Curated annotation (Swiss-Prot):
Cell compartments where the protein resides: Mitochondrion membrane
Transmembrane segments annotated in the record for this chain: 1-21, 34-54, 63-85, 89-111, 128-148, 169-189, 211-231
Protein name according to UniProt: NADH-ubiquinone oxidoreductase chain 4
Native species: Cerrophidion godmani (Porthidium godmani)
EC class: translocase
Reaction catalyzed: a ubiquinone + NADH + 5 H(+)(in) = a ubiquinol + NAD(+) + 4 H(+)(out)
Major subcellular location class: mitochondrion
GO terms for MF: NADH dehydrogenase (ubiquinone) activity; ubiquinone binding
Family: Belongs to the complex I subunit 4 family.
GO cellular component terms, A-Z: mitochondrial membrane
PANTHER family linked to this entry: NADH-UBIQUINONE OXIDOREDUCTASE CHAIN 4
Membrane topology (UniProt): Multi-pass membrane protein
Length: 231
């Protein structure tokens, strides 16, 4: 069920990050070197989740693995225990909560009209539902972390924290962000561009679906304009 996926990606997945933040407060802040294996594992896990996204054919699985990859960055930023790292982790959890929930919602609107989640069978929607394509584009741009979104601000804070801690981590971070952009564009182009494969009449998007998307993306844009609300 789509509601379960949206709540899982937006709220429950972030509770793990919150738990790590509370747990790290009990540990010494001066000995971050002993957490080196965990930071490397978190970044490596993010890259592996991103690579898994690239080979997904199921739309919902792709979005789910995307959430996992972003949480790898969050965990790495929290473990370093600097103010910038914690601010970036908190901002990324909030930003990606909105983004992944919106993507799951869009995947469901596509599934209701095509009755399939296979990427190659859902293409050509920009000809049939142009407004849906606009929502897809906005959600994917936020997933890629393009400026001036909150996703960009949070990833910039996390990158600065990790680079300041160990400059070598920029290789893993850069690779992770490159793959994120690749699978996000692949997801958008696969579902929206190309000739449509649907022979039946597709019903238009309902007002409730537009409202649901607006309630995801408008608050995120507003927080992006004033990030000090959460950072």
């Amino acid at each position: 069920p789509i509601a379960g996926s949206m709540v899982l990606a937006a709220v429950l997945l972030k509770l793990g990050g919150y738990g790590i933040i509370r747990m790290m407060q009990t540990l010494p802040t001066t000995k971050t070197d002993m957490f080196l294996p965990f930071i490397v594992l978190a970044l490596w896990g993010a890259i592996l989740a991103n690579l898994t996204c690239l080979q997904q054919t199921d739309l919902k699985s792709l979005i789910a693995y995307s959430s996992i990859s972003h949480m790898g960055l969050v965990v790495a930023a929290i473990i370093i225990q600097t103010p910038w790292g914690l601010s970036g982790a908190m901002a990324l959890m909030i930003a990606h909560g909105f983004t992944s929930s919106a993507l799951f919602c869009l995947a469901n609107t596509t599934y209701e009209r095509t009755h399939t989640r296979i990427l190659i069978l859902t293409r050509g929607f920009h000809n049939i539902l142009p407004m849906t394509t606009t929502w897809w584009l906005l959600a994917n741009l936020m997933n890629i972390a393009t400026p001036p979104t909150l996703n960009f601000t949070s990833e910039l804070l996390i990158m600065s924290t990790l680079f300041n801690w160990c400059p070598t981590t920029i290789i893993l971070l850069g690779l992770s962000m490159l793959i994120t952009a690749s699978y996000s564009l692949h997801m958008f182009l696969s579902t929206q561009m190309g000739p449509t494969l649907l022979n039946n009449q597709t019903e238009p998007m309902h007002s409730r679906e537009h409202l649901l998307m607006a309630l995801h993306l408008v608050p995120l844009m507003m927080i992006s304009m004033k990030p000090e609300l959460i950072i």
